[in-house]
């Protein structure tokens, strides 16, 4: 059900939950509408337009009705019902459409009314006010000029504590359901605000003594342990790992879900928390642990849990980045190519929602840059359409990387890597001006060292492709290296081109050592023997598959034409 301001011209039947049409503030006269909106922008936040008041009341009634219905379902020992599903759908419409449109119209660069101002409109409903504050502070972080103040950062943290305490510390399952998109956004924003605060507290140059004292006296606010504790608690409460384990083995996850995990709220929060842990460990530079938390998620299969595109894109971005830093180049390339192909095929779907499109488009660009790095360091064949996109975006930069230009590597890594952070509270008495950059600089140094070790490999590969046998000393001369230096570089080539590659199994950490290099060689005394291992592209199979698809389509069209 849409919020009536979105379709005020329609002549729909009376709906007791809808707003009367006279609450819509459009007069039909563009000049009057513009004058009204300008007048509103000059008012204080305590003066709330009727359209916003009634939107809040409608929003509250929808959430309140859902909670009442959920209480009834829990008392009847039922997990869900069509009524619950309908209410969740209504909340999703409010969340994704009405809230976004009203924000754009009234609060584009200013905060929504404070919770205290709208509390009388909703009967001081504690649960609704927690949900409202979650949206309120998220909007301040995203759109309000200057971002959140120190006080607002603390208040947002306390609000998340209240939300998670309500969900985790209830005597039984909390009588609440929310759309999957909102649940994902809660986890995503929770980690983003922790990341933002970790950077904020390290930048002390422009902070007053009062602010620094306030930070010093509250070290547990946005503490990494509390963030990890929330995510692990949601995972444990939902029993999501056991559910995924049973699901991937073909069983019924409901059979092991437990009292809480049977409910969509807990199940989806548990799943999204696993992705949140992947992201958090990546931000902290612990890539092995980042992938390990997903050991029960089979990335190479479509999952019933992956219903939110942003969650899927985020998962592949961080898994691909972790693979890249662990020198599992084949796996990184496979992961990036798969998700980029998915984005390419579904891009039009995201363009309907601006905020989704912006986020996915940014990660899409970052993953193209990471794929360019991975393919330069470990050349292999990928999907032709992705390869074409990559050449258009980064063709020149890839050529420069192949020639060993470290500046391009650093530029692409800096653009596409996550915003690394330090979990440690800084020493406020002596904070270095670039202290907030140290985690990034450390990761950049490790990456640059790896690039430096492989600087000669691209040139060596191009020479090896030209010959089948050659004296080691002669080939070393072509490269202006001594024979001993060249033998060392050949050993480096062998070592770096052999990767741990996922082949089967659920855990993304599983794998066996393989080499997908297009050339291989061995040294017999003073001679190097080279073999071209490149597999010729089998065009015949491609055309046969397309012919079968065309014939199937033809048969389907003929059947459709025969219908009366």
UniProtKB/Swiss-Prot annotation:
Residue numbers of Phosphoserine PTMs: 21
Annotated Gene Ontology cellular component terms: eukaryotic 43S preinitiation complex; eukaryotic 48S preinitiation complex; eukaryotic translation initiation factor 3 complex
GO terms for biological process, alphabetical: formation of cytoplasmic translation initiation complex; translational initiation
InterPro entries linked: eIF3l, PCI_dom, TPR-like_helical_dom_sf
MF-aspect GO terms: translation initiation factor activity
N6-acetyllysine: modified positions: 465, 549
Primary site of residence: cytoplasm
Keyword Ion transport: no
Post-translational modification N-acetylserine, affected residues: 2
Pfam families per UniProt: Paf67
Domain PCI: 331-537
Subunit and partners: Component of the eukaryotic translation initiation factor 3 (eIF-3) complex, which is composed of 13 subunits: EIF3A, EIF3B, EIF3C, EIF3D, EIF3E, EIF3F, EIF3G, EIF3H, EIF3I, EIF3J, EIF3K, EIF3L and EIF3M. The eIF-3 complex appears to include 3 stable modules: module A is composed of EIF3A, EIF3B, EIF3G and EIF3I; module B is composed of EIF3F, EIF3H, and EIF3M; and module C is composed of EIF3C, EIF3D, EIF3E, EIF3K and EIF3L. EIF3C of module C binds EIF3B of module A and EIF3H of module B, thereby linking the three modules. EIF3J is a labile subunit that binds to the eIF-3 complex via EIF3B.
Name of the molecule in the record: Eukaryotic translation initiation factor 3 subunit L
Source organism: Pan troglodytes (Chimpanzee)
């Amino acid at each position: 059900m849409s919020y009536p301001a979105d379709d005020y011209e329609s002549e729909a039947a009376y709906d007791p939950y809808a707003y009367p049409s006279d609450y819509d503030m459009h007069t039909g006269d563009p000049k009057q509408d513009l004058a009204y909106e300008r007048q509103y922008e000059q008012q204080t936040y305590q003066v709330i337009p009727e359209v916003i008041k009634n939107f809040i009341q409608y929003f509250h009634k929808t959430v309140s009705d859902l909670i009442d219905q959920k209480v009834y379902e829990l008392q009847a020992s039922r997990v869900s019902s069509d009524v619950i599903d309908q209410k969740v759908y209504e909340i999703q419409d409010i969340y994704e459409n009405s809230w976004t449109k009203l924000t754009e119209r009234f609060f584009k660069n200013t905060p929504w009314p404070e919770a205290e101002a709208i509390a009388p409109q909703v009967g001081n409903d504690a649960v609704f006010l927690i949900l409202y504050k979650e949206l309120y502070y998220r909007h301040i972080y995203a759109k309000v000029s200057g971002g959140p103040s120190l006080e607002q950062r603390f208040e947002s943290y306390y609000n998340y504590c209240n939300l998670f305490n309500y969900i985790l510390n209830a005597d039984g399952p909390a009588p609440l359901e929310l759309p999957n998109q909102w649940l994902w956004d809660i986890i995503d924003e929770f980690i983003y605000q922790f990341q933002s605060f970790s950077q904020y507290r390290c930048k002390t140059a422009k902070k007053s003594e009062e602010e620094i004292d306030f930070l010093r006296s509250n070290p547990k606010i946005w503490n990494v342990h509390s963030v990890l504790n929330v995510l692990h608690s949601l995972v444990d409460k939902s029993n999501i790992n056991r559910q995924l384990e049973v699901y991937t083995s073909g069983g019924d996850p409901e059979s092991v879900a437990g009292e809480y995990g049977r409910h969509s709220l807990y199940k989806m929060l548990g799943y999204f928390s696993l992705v949140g842990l992947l992201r958090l460990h990546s931000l902290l530079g612990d890539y092995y642990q980042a992938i390990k938390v997903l050991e029960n998620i089979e990335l190479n299969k479509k999952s019933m849990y992956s219903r939110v595109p942003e969650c899927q894109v985020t998962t592949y971005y961080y898994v691909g980045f972790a693979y890249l830093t662990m020198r599992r180049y084949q796996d990184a390339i496979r992961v990036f190519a798969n998700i980029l192909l998915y984005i390419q095929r579904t891009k039009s779907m995201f363009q309907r929602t601006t905020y989704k499109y912006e986020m996915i488009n940014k990660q899409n660009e970052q993953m193209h840059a990471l794929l360019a790095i991975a393919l330069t360091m470990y050349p292999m064949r990928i999907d032709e359409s992705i390869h074409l996109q990559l050449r258009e975006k980064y063709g020149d930069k890839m050529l420069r990387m192949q020639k060993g230009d470290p500046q391009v590597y650093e530029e692409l890594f800096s653009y596409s890597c996550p915003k690394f952070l330090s979990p440690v509270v800084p020493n406020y008495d002596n904070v270095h001006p670039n202290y907030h950059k140290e985690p990034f600089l450390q990761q950049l140094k490790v990456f640059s060292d790896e690039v430096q070790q492989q600087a000669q490999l691209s040139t060596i590969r191009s020479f090896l492709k030209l010959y089948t046998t050659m004296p080691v000393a002669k080939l070393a001369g072509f490269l202006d290296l001594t024979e001993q230096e060249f033998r060392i570089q050949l050993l480096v080539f062998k070592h770096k081109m052999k990767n741990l590659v996922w082949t089967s199994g659920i855990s993304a950490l599983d794998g066996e050592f393989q080499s997908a290099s297009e050339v291989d060689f061995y040294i017999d005394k003073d001679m190097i023997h080279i073999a071209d291992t490149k597999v010729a592209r089998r065009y015949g199979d491609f055309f046969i598959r397309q012919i079968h698809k065309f014939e199937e389509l033809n048969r389907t069209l003929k059947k459709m034409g025969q219908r009366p």
